[in-house]
Amino acid sequence: MSDQPAQSDLPDQGALPPQEAAQPQAVREDPQPQQCAQQVLFEQQGAQHRVYISNLSQDATEEALTEFLKDFHPVSVLIPSQSVRGFQKTSVRPLGIAYVEFKDADTAAKVILELNGVTFMDRELRLRYHIPFKSEKEKLARGPNKFRQIQRRLSELRRRNSDAGATVTTDNGPQVDAAAVPREMSKVTIYVGRLPGRTTDKDLRTYFHEYLPQEIIVFKHRQFRGWRIRRHVTAAVITFPDHERQESALESLSNLPFNGRTVRMAPAFEDKLAEIRAEVQRMAVEQQLPQPASNLGIYIGNNLIAMQPLQTRKADQQSLQSQHSPQNAAEDQTITAPPPSQQQLPQLQPIAPPLSLQPLNPVENTQPVQGLDLSIPREHEEVVRGQPLLRLQKLQMIQRLQRLHRQKQRQQIQQEPAAQPAAQPAAQPATEAAVAPQLVPEQEAHQAAAQAEPQQVLERPIAAGA
């Protein structure tokens, strides 16, 4: 640890300027194997000999890990553990991490590049440089936020590697670099930000109706305020016929509230506008939506997320005509039962015309449906399932079938009592006449048997005495 090599001897340090090498570098908890080169590039100031290993198996020991790293000749291997106290005994459990120290920085960098993501005891190892602990006083004395410094350095590296300039993130917020190419502003499209969350393109079209807006796209994007604070902001881009109407809208409506909220208006960027339109077209093709992009509302998070249609389409005339086709009318007629004979049930009302000829009255039909039993009689179940009708027509048809079923039950109940009293008066005398002759011989036989028994009893003693 005491032998520190020179700054020029470090691998990958020659690609960085001297003023950037002294800045703290980005370190990720779980880097991917393909990102190891970037991680070695973003090492801390000075040489690093100690490597931090995470996602280590609970069964791994220091001897097994030393044997696994024997090709790199580790100086020391440490697997920290913790003591868990129970009611009867205390157990020691490893933390699943390890600290391995090597003899030089080149070996540590080679270990990170080659073994990051390698499986050891059924676990993929995660390797990075060890970050020494620093007290709160050292953190306060360090100056600006480390995360912002890392973001600024990454932005500078991206800007140097790209042909076109981009924004550079500083401590005071996003600022445009002086060497970057200025972004082109649209001459007919404006950006409207800080809109209410439920704003639709119809509301904006009404608000800008004097300036004849041609295209309105509503979207949402995320704003990051710090490491954990995020919020969604509703915005829109509005395209006008010419540059004069764009300037008039910006001058007259910039300071006026929209639905009780002060909005932000400015000319839109051409590159951002092209990105939004391309995303709208792509999502429209994927979802196979027939309406144009100007009638669509979208959510764009991180500047592009899910689709939100803002207008409903009118019903197709062909679908309405197909519902009232002659074939459906013939099927409706098959549902109606034949009228009962007037001789049996003169009090029943005549059957109503088919459903296709009846006027639809939602007020009349929706009230009794609340407590309605939607069970369909078995004899009409197949007919109901084959009808491509609307919801209101289906409810009317179910009511009609249930009324027919109840009428049929009442008809059967009324016919059965009417048949029984007519047959009983004629059958009753015949049964009495048939039973009466049978009772007379039986009574005479019992009387004769009763008279004959005493005589037999008296005759037996006489015969015995004789």
From Swiss-Prot:
Chain residue ranges for the region called Disordered? 1-33, 311-347, 406-466
Domain RRM: start-end pairs: 49-132, 188-270
UniProt keyword terms in alphabetical order: Repeat, RNA-binding, Transcription, Transcription regulation
Q: In its keyword annotation, does this UniProt entry include Metal-binding?
A: no
Sequence ranges of Polar residues compositional bias: 317-336
According to the UniProt entry, its GO molecular function terms are: mRNA binding
Classify the source by domain of life. Answer: Eukaryota
Q: Does the keyword Transcription regulation apply?
A: yes
Amino acid composition bias (Low complexity), ranges on this chain:
17-26, 410-456
Q: Which Gene3D superfamilies match?
A: 3.30.70.330
In terms of Pfam families, this protein maps to: RRM_1
Listed InterPro entries? Nucleotide-bd_a/b_plait_sf, RBD_domain_sf, RRM_dom, Rrt5_RRM1, Rrt5_RRM2, RRT5_SRSF_SR
Gene Ontology terms, cellular component aspect?
cytoplasm; nucleus; ribonucleoprotein complex
Q: What does this protein do?
A: May be involved in the modulation of rDNA transcription.
Q: Which family does it belong to?
A: Belongs to the RRT5 family.
The protein's name = Regulator of rDNA transcription protein 5
Q: Which organism is it from?
A: Eremothecium gossypii (strain ATCC 10895 / CBS 109.51 / FGSC 9923 / NRRL Y-1056)
